């Protein structure tokens, strides 16, 4: 795959925040300076448990926008695209039955959130996008390019951030083709114990865990191969 910028979680957060700030910037007339179709989704590549979701939530909080997180491995073709149903249409005086799709669960959730909170802008964070099933992979690629699931587009004011695990942590990882990398702004996050420790203190990770990791620093980086892939 295409290599991005390698950085620790703190630097990654800054990078994401700067990009998000640019994407949310409006001109004097209240239009986004960078239109939705020009915004390349960020793709955060980093090991599980490094705090990807947490930094997205922090960035959203600091920018005063909403955030909606999904792990794409929990989604099926139906929940991403919407469910098919039969609609009746009239063409030239004759009635026909055609398939329509209900709204994508993910897109519907954005509208629900805007309705419930009154927040009009937000970050849609889709994790584990490189571990999706074969049937979801083409849908995901189309989404990354056009920001649509089925017939429904991500509403204006919502910015897409994606993340994935490196192949050594998950044997169901798909390699994106080079075309896909051109659509994404890739950020590679490296485990960095000292930065993680500072971050962990702030977020309240138990002191015993920190002490243990301080003594056994190797455990912080170690990946043990288990039967069903890497943990």
What are the language-model segments listed below?
Residues 4-67, 72-124, 129-231:
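C-terminal regulatory/interaction module of P-loop NTP-utilizing enzymes
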